[in-house]
Amino acid sequence: MRTDFFQFFSYFCRKMAKQTLVIETAKELSLNDGMIAITDRDTGEIELRSLEDVQMVMIDNHSARMTVPLITKLVANNVSIVYCDETHMPVSMMMDLESNTLQSKRFQNQLAASVPTNKQLWRQIVEAKIRNQSLLLEKLGKGKNLLMQYYDNVKSGDSTNREGIAAKVYWRKLMGKDFIRDRYGEPPNSMLNYGYTVLRSMMSRSLMNAGLLPTVGIFHRNCYDAFPLADDMMEPYRPYVDRKVLDLMEDGVTEVCKQSKKALLELFFNDIPANAMLMSASTLAGVYEGKGKIVVFPKIC
């Protein structure tokens, strides 16, 4: 029944799917009669975009500019603003701090969550991640139910590290025995980094929309990590990025470039079920409120 509701919810929300506006050249963004005005600073040409059609603005050019009135309007309309560095990797994000009317109460519930509750939540997250990794390998013809032995043995808090053990098998089967998943490693690691960073931004936005604090994690608790809860909740979604990177590699693309950035951004509107991350965040908030025990994550298809 929960799966049926999730499918209906995803279908309904897809009808209202929004887009990411990516600025890659020297343009100025301003507010014009309630619309986003995008002015080419070289030609003076102006393009207008409706605020209602945009859920994220990504600034990927250090010469681009945005006016304060537009920034204020964007965050008031729950549009995230993401800034990229000189390597085109997203490095910072601006979001509305009052995106949910139940925010204060949900913050309190989240902070009051017991250790056993968080351990059970982490078990669910790890199970969902391993399940999607296993499904992806099966769909790619790289092994049926290969990781399910680890899925079936995840304990509270993943005390036996089934996630790490499954990951070793997963990457070897997915990318080949010579591949090493390393943030600073050789291609296609940079594309994985880019996709995961965008995923993290999208999950942070969904958590804020659900009235949760992305800064308070379930498992990730590094004091230098700004969004540990997003890092926790994005785990079951990583295989979506992995599959898109594989598709790009089949097309001969191995590094972050215009083609790979476009494909990885479109992933969040074409491949991942619409509003799936908001559903995951909302059901997590429900667990903290005592209204349920299950966090909903989509199955990769």
Q: What residue spans do the PLM features occupy?
A:
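N- or domain-start disorder-to-order transition segments that initiate the globular core
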Residues: C13-S50
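N-terminal amphipathic/basic-hydrophobic helices that include classical n-h-c signal peptides
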Residues: M1-K15
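Generic structural signal for well-ordered secondary structure
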Residues: L29, S50, S63-T67, K119, ...
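A broad, structure-centric signal for solvent-exposed, well-ordered loop/edge residues
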Residues: I38, E45, M56-M58, M66, ...
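A short alpha-helix capping/helix-coil boundary motif
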Residues: L48-L51, R181-R183
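Glycine/small-residue-rich interface belts in oligomeric ring/scaffold proteins
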Residues: R49-L102
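Active-site helix-to-loop segments that bind/position phosphate- or nucleotide-bearing substrates
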Residues: F9, A17-T20, A26-K27, M35, ...
